[in-house]
Amino acid sequence: TLIFLVEQEEVFMIYLDHAATTPVPKAVADAMYTVLTEEFGNPSAQYPMGQEMHRRVDAWRAVIAGAVGCEAKQLYFTSCGTEGDNWAIRAACWQNRHTGRHIVTTAVEHHAVLNCCQQLEQEGWEVTRILPDRNGDISAEAVLAAVRPDTALVSVMMVNNELGNIYPIADIARGLKAINDKTLLHTDAVQGFLKVPFSAKTLGADFITLSGHKIGAPKGIGALYIGPRVRNPRPLLPGGGQEMGLRSGTEATAQIAGFAKAVELRCDHLEDKLRHMAEVKAYAVEKLSAIPDLHIIGDGKAPHVLSVSMAGWPSQNVVTDLGSQGICISAGSACHQGKSSQVVAALHLPKRVAAGVIRLSFGPETTFADIDACAEALRNHHDRRMPML
């Protein structure tokens, strides 16, 4: 349970939307404050304060790279996951532009991937979108069956942000090497980083997208892993040559400091935190399954994401009602609110079920009491209101 201020009054809040964003721990805010107010040097400056900040950025990069399982020189800071996704897709297409103009992705990707691919279609590229099965799963076999000699890129997310399904990135990587070793592989790991164990060294992806604010870092900072098979990647932003010449612009040093501190905090007793989130999720499934007309959606194995539907009760009404009681859940991806979910649409659920899908997502701070309160509020919503669908 968290406390926040609304018009200077303390309001108790049960936060169950960690897949949208996460609370920033005080230690992260303190690390950022120090950089903002005392250690504010430009890393490109040649005087001692600038050179010291350059060393600090290198050290922070190494911390995050260690958690990713890659070399520091393979990790490039970005402003967000959306930027990383777009950069990876464009860089892969640029490298393979002379050997093929075909992309394989899925119908349940984040809109950063879907819309970038749609833009490339308008530029003459062909895109194949793999549909999930009825449980929301994407098999490596289905992805690999779509790969052709002219496939430049395969882009498949690591963890679905609405369902929590984990997709077989390592299996796809191994299959690609046998089918077409020129095809590059990108995975959006925004919902997987420090929630699903992986190492860039063994995963096999050529690009891995990360976002800081999903693990307790501030908004406005992310990173992109670029592997050794990517030759001379095209710079995202030409300019002063920051980020090893690939993403120019003065580094957001405070955000980078916060990102590194958040990684340190999350990695401390990480297995215990993941086990706790998995236990909270299992408890939520048990409690919510007892509510009439409530369905568990998907087959998500990630420990922090759970989608359910109260069939007949519109999701936005449920979200608004619980929000008025201080319980924060979502009606889908918070990155694309106001439009119907492409993930839910791809499952071909009955209309009454699809219109009632809500997402709960958990963090290390989520308690069993939080789940009890949410379950009670959902049951009360069901009992007080007649179905509208």
Positions of PLM-derived features:
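Pyridoxal 5′-phosphate
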Residues: 3-389
